[in-house]
Amino acid sequence: MQDKWDKRFTRVAQEISAWSKDPSKQIGAVAVNDDRRILATGYNGFPKGIEDIPERYEDRSIKYDLVVHAEMNCIYNATFNGISLKDATLYVFGLPVCHDCAKGIIQVGINKIVMSMDDIPQKWLDSFEKSRRMFDEANVDVHFLNGTNH
């Protein structure tokens, strides 16, 4: 039964990812409580009030200085709205959780992550391995959908 819900919320994260204006990669995140209620969503993009024009996405040095990852955007949106993510599940579509986002996920008390991606790109392997070690130590359950088994 849970697998059905994991797939549903992963599809929601995929839909949210389409809101990103990043032409190279769209990532989506959805935080859900035990009652299967959506608490917050996020996608990779610039902070509120920062103009997200195409030229800024084309210049990687500018883009990487400005972009907020989907996972942290989801956490910030929950915080902005006064919503606790303690014991929530975070569904992430598009890329694995990086080690910087892992810190935030652990800090707010998210206890399960479901990730969906075709494969983990080589350039993200080191960061994901750091995330995995942190999640293991902090007792955060990590699951994969779409046939990924990392």
What are these regions (language model features)?
Residues 1-150:
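Zinc-dependent deaminase catalytic domain
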